Amino acid sequence: RSVKLLSEEENVKNKIWQQTRLHEYLNEMPVSQILIEGIEADDIIAQICNEMYVGDYEKVIVSSDKDFIQRCDNSTVLYRPIQKKVLNKNTVIDEYKISPNWFALARAITGDKSDNLAGVGGVGLKTIARRFPFFSDPHRASCFYQLYEHCRENIDGPKVYKTVLENKDLVESNYKLMQLYAPSMSPQNKSII
C-alpha cells in the first residue's frame, strides 16, 4: 500500500516499524549505535567529535544538514550525500568565504528555515562573507564581541551593521540553539558516549 494512502495513525505506525527494522539491521552489522532519550542526533555526533578517544582519527559526518559545516576541521569532514560533496575546513572557506569556526555564528545571523529559526532580515551568507571578512579566518575564534564591535565601527556604512546590532538577542538565541562546538548534554549522557 502506498505511504500516501495511509492515515495519520497508520503513517506513525509505519515510521516506527521502519525505524525498528533499521535498528535491527544495523545490529547485525559492524555499526555502533548511540541512542539517548531526549538528545538530538546532531548533539550526539558533535559530542563524539569532541571526545578524546577519537582524537585525530579522521571523522566523516554524513548529512546534508548545514549545521554540521561548523564541525569541519583538520580531522573531521562532512559528506553531503544529496549535494554529492565532501567538505573540509579548506573547502568550506573556499565555497562560503566563512571558516567553520565562525559558521555557527554566521548561521545564527541568517537563521535556519529547516529548524524554523528566523534570521536577521536581508542578511545571507554572501553578505556576511562580504561585510565581515574576519569570518574567513580559521585561526580566529568566533565571538559576539568581535561581531558587535565591527558593527559599531561600521554603523554609518551599509545597513547590515545596524540591523545585526538591533537583533543581538535573536542572534545570541539562535547561536545557543545552533552551535555544535559544545553541545549541551548532562555529564551522565556524555558518559554514555
Task: State what each model feature region is.
Residues 5-190:
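Extended two-metal-dependent nuclease catalytic cores across DNA- and RNA-processing enzymes
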